[in-house]
């Protein structure tokens, strides 16, 4: 039996939904190697037929049915992708009918509602949150910190910046971050500029070995990246968090998505759009 399988994530818009749901399912099959391809903006029957022809050729080449995950609103476009030599997993067809029955209402079947700019006010809020996080990255801008929903604090390279941007983009959270420097860590006292915002602080920590590896790629053979320094910084940062009752989590074995979701839950933050 071949351990190689083609998988397509097809959508009439960005492809984010089909890709995310399909990828989640495929991660449960570790022994298989999936050749993944995302195909967005398949919004006409003509486009669907052309794509179906290409997928059919791949099925003949591989002697295996490709896996086709779709999140397409238009039933005619969906039908054009229904082939005998593919496994079609249609997220819309699988769930929308059950919801219509339960809710007693027909779905509007409007393309682009999940990831399109349907509501300008919500979209603007999302962009404002991203700009806020960019402007308040790495402690560069300390003004307006009172407008932050959360302030991530941690040693350098503990995952603060990508987490802030993900919180802004995915949840509309105004997330600032502040890097704990050696000067900050010399005392258990919180950095002076953060004292008024203690209730908004959330700490990120990381395993010293992992931190050493990350820093060594950036600045090899430096004191900054040395194992002793990484261990000291992490220990002092965690002591500071505990001393002041600042909640914190380890980012060592977590993805950005997991870190952000954990912060949303533990800090009792709500989605802003």
UniProtKB/Swiss-Prot annotation:
Binding site for ADP: 154-161
Signal peptide location: none
Record's protein name: Putative phosphoenolpyruvate synthase regulatory protein
HAMAP family cross-referenced by the UniProt entry: PSRP
Enzyme Commission no: 2.7.11.33, 2.7.4.28
EC class name: transferase
Keyword terms: Kinase, Nucleotide-binding, Serine/threonine-protein kinase, Transferase
PANTHER family xref list: PYRUVATE, PHOSPHATE DIKINASE REGULATORY PROTEIN 1, CHLOROPLASTIC
Family: Belongs to the pyruvate, phosphate/water dikinase regulatory protein family. PSRP subfamily.
């Amino acid at each position: 039996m071949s351990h190689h399988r083609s998988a397509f994530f097809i959508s009439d818009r960005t492809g984010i939904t089909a890709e995310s749901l399909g990828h989640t399912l495929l991660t449960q099959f570790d022994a298989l190697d999936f050749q993944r391809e995302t195909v967005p903006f398949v919004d006409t029957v003509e486009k669907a037929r052309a794509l179906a022809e290409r997928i059919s050729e791949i099925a003949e080449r591989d002697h295996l049915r490709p896996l086709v995950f779709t999140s397409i609103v238009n039933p005619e476009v969906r039908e054009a992708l229904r082939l005998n030599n593919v496994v079609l997993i249609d997220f819309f067809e699988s769930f929308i009918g059950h919801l219509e029955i339960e809710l007693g209402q027909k779905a509007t079947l409007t393309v682009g509602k999940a990831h399109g700019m349907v509501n300008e006010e919500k979209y603007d809020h999302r962009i404002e949150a991203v700009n806020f996080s960019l402007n308040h990255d790495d402690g560069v801008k300390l003004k307006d910190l009172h407008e932050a929903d959360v302030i991530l604090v941690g040693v350098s390279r503990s995952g603060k910046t990508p987490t802030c941007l993900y919180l802004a983009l995915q949840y509309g959270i105004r997330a600032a971050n502040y890097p704990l420097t050696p000067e900050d860590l010399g005392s258990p006292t919180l950095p002076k500029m953060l004292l008024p915002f203690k209730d908004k602080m959330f700490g990120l920590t990381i395993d010293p070995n992992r931190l050493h590896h990350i820093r060594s790629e950036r600045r090899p053979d430096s004191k900054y990246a040395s194992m002793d320094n990484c261990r000291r910084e992490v220990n002092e940062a965690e002591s500071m968090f505990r001393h002041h009752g600042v909640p914190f989590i380890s980012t060592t074995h977590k993805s950005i998505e997991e870190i952000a979701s954990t912060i949303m839950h533990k800090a009792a933050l709500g989605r802003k759009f």
